[in-house]
Swiss-Prot record:
It comes from Rattus norvegicus (Rat). The keyword Acyltransferase does not apply. CDD domains: IgC1_CH1_IgEG, IgC1_CH3_IgAGD_CH4_IgAEM. InterPro entries: Ig-like_dom, Ig-like_dom_sf, Ig-like_fold, Ig_C1-set, Immune_Resp_Modulators. This is Ig gamma-2A chain C region. GO terms for cellular component: immunoglobulin complex, circulating.
Length: 322
């Protein structure tokens, strides 16, 4: 896929606001490739009440939403701007969120709800003992009309196995409702389409959101482990690195073990598109120098659908004299 700059749309409630109420404003960042984009509010000056949802990949392009909750008095007295940066396309967009003019027909007095659908976690999809779930989230539900009904479809056939949680009250006095659909691993890997349909008395019409696995032939990664650089051995903490390259789609899970025990002190870079259209990432495990020098075995473990049995791992340990 080619590098594509995002389109940025402001999201504002279409209702008259009470002076003492909280208001949630949003920014829709649509149709970009590759990851990542960064979203800040008022160039970082607004940081509390910010929620940026994970990006969703559909038809080869990513879409992401970020929201910020502020007192309505703040919104009416000062500008609220979302700042979007997409390094891959050298794009920077500042979008001011302005109150929508209320026409007499359009103002019902109810909040404007938004619906988001999220893919299952990669680890859940590729581990037979875990249960992958597609998740549908509705935000900004008015307490005046809190009933929300979820319907789920797999390839347009309705299913009734979803687990819908009780609505949760948010800091801006609206409600948030979540429905999770447990799915069969193979259905996701085979590219079936999962659709969430949300209905409410407050909606003029049902809202539908769909998601499926990115199209294209899976390619398994090559995995390489690298010992701490010699120059780093003067420090008390050293880095063990795992390079994972040549994989598609970008959905992958990488973790570390020491002597077979899971470790937590590691960080992964996001999957990044390489020049050939495949993806690569680096994973860095931090350990004490003595832990490395004692000859413990460190293993980089990778889950990806293009691998045999969806799994591979590479180990290394310190050898005296190296």
């Amino acid at each position: 896929a080619e590098t594509t700059a995002p389109s940025v749309y402001p999201l504002a409630p279409g209702t008259a606001l009470k002076s003492n109420s909280m208001v949630t404003l949003g920014c829709l960042v649509k149709g970009y490739f590759p990851e990542p984009v960064t979203v800040t509010w008022n160039s970082g000056a607004l940081s509390s009440g910010v929620h940026t949802f994970p990006a969703v990949l559909q038809s080869g392009l990513y879409t992401l939403t970020s929201s910020v909750t502020v007192p309505s008095s703040t919104w009416s007295s000062q500008a609220v701007t979302c700042n979007v940066a997409h390094p891959a396309s050298s794009t920077k967009v500042d979008k001011k969120i302005v109150p929508r003019e209320c026409n007499p027909c359009g103002c019902t007095g109810s909040e404007v709800s938004s619906v988001f659908i999220f893919p299952p976690k990669t680890k859940d999809v590729l581990t037979i003992t875990l249960t992958p779930k597609v998740t549908c989230v509705v935000v900004d539900i008015s307490q005046n009309d809190p009933e929300v009904r979820f319907s789920w479809f797999i390839d347009d056939v309705e299913v009734h196995t979803a687990q819908t949680h009780a609505p949760e009250k948010q800091s801006n006095s609206t409600l948030r409702s979540v429905s999770e659909l447990p799915i069969v691993h193979r259905d996701w890997l085979n590219g079936k389409t999962f659709k969430c349909k949300v209905n409410s008395g407050a909606f003029p019409a049902p809202i539908e959101k769909s998601i499926s696995k990115p199209e294209g032939t899976p390619r398994g990664p090559q995995v390489y482990t690298m010992a701490p650089p010699k120059e780093e051995m003067t420090q008390s903490q050293v880095s063990i690195t795992c390079m994972v390259k040549g994989f598609y789609p970008p959905d992958i899970y990488t973790e570390w073990k020491m002597n077979g025990q899971p470790q937590e002190n590691y960080k992964n870079t996001p999957p990044t598109m390489d020049t050939d259209g495949s993806y690569f990432l680096y994973s860095k495990l931090n350990v004490k120098k003595e832990t490395w020098q004692q000859g413990n075995t460190f293993t980089c473990s990778v889950l990806h659908e293009g691998l045999h049995n969806h799994h591979t791992e590479k180990s290394l340990s310190h050898s005296p004299g190296k």
